[in-house]
Amino acid sequence: MSAVIAPEAAGGPEQLIWALLAEVPDPELPVLSIVDLGIVRHVRQDLDGRLHVGLTPTYSGCPATEVIRIAVRAALDAGGYADAVLEEVLSPPWTSEWLTSAARAKLTAFGIAPPEEPVLSPRRLWQAPLVTCPRCGSRATERVSEFGSTPCKAHYRCSACQEPFDYFKCL
C-alpha cells in the first residue's frame, strides 16, 4: 500500500522531489518542465519509506522518453534521492489536456500555439483544430505541415501577421 501525492498536497521529501522535477526541462520543449507538461503522474512513498516517481510518456515512441528518464534520475541523484524508483505509467495515457495553465502560457510566450480544444471535442472529429497565432492572437491561421519541428507539433502560418509558428497538437 502507498499514498499518491499530488504537488499541491505534498510535504516532506515528496514536496522536495516535486520541486526537483519542476526544474527538469522537457528536451523537445525546454521552455516547459516535465511537471508543466503533466507527465509526472505521482510521487509516493511506500510502507518501507522508499519513494516512487511515476512518469507517463507523451506518446508511444516519443524520442524524448529515455532522455527524460535520464534527466529525472540525475535530478533525483543530485537531490539525494538515488534510491527513488522510477515507474513508467501507461494508463491512463498522457493527453495534452494535462498541460498546466502555466505550460500553456509559457508555450504562447515562446511562440508555440498550445492546444485550445478538448481532445475528445466532437468538432475535432470533422474539422481542423482552431489555432490562435501566438504572436498576434488572430484565429486566421492555416496549417502548412502536419509535422513541425518535433512530431508532437504541426507547422502553421498566420494570415494576419504572416508569421510561421508551431502548434502543439492535441494528443
Question: Which residues make up each language-model segment?
Answer:
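A short amphipathic beta-strand at an alpha->beta junction
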Residues: 1, 74-97
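N-terminal presequence-like segments and adjacent domain-start helices
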Residues: 1-23
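Generic non-transmembrane alpha-helical segments
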Residues: 16, 20-24, 28, 71, ...
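Residue-level signature of catalytic and energy-coupling elements of molecular machines
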Residues: 21, 40, 62, 84
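Short secondary-structure junctions
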Residues: 24-36, 79-82, 135-140
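Short edge beta-strands and adjacent turn/loop segments
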Residues: 31-56
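Short, non-transmembrane amphipathic alpha-helical segments
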Residues: 59-83
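Cys/His-clustered metal-coordination modules, chiefly Zn-binding fingers
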Residues: 105-171
